[in-house]
Regions:
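Charge-dense, helix-prone N-terminal extensions
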Residues: 1-114
Length: 114
């Protein structure tokens, strides 16, 4: 997936912002990270997103996907080989990560995401 398409999809989610941080692009919903693109210049070197422990087991069984460094164990994965997840599947995982993070926000803030 191309960088511009990945950024556009993530930014299409409600109240999403992006900052350059930790050598990549960090996407946040109301200041809570839900997705990260790691970069070498303009080249994607991986993506990181949140998942449930059950999803973690399913995802890390695939080659090219492992525990995201510096993130909660069994809750965040890093995809190094984007070919492992086709574009629709990656978009679904990004959306799922957004939903998991948004679910932890206050009810008042959650109402602004609809």
């Amino acid at each position: 997936m191309r960088l511009d398409r990945l950024k556009a999809f993530a930014l299409s989610l409600p109240r999403t912002t992006v900052v350059k941080q930790w050598g990549g692009l960090v996407f946040k919903v109301v200041d809570k990270m839900f997705f990260m693109i790691t970069l070498d210049g303009e080249v994607i070197t991986g993506v990181i997103f949140k998942c449930t422990p059950a999803e973690f087991d399913e995802l890390t069984a695939l080659d090219g996907i492992g525990q995201a460094p510096y993130c909660a164990k069994r809750m965040w994965v890093r995809v190094e080989d984007l070919a492992v997840l086709p574009e629709p599947a990656l978009q679904a995982r990004i959306r799922r990560s957004f939903d998991l993070v948004a679910a932890k926000l206050t009810k008042k803030v959650q109402a602004t995401l609809r």
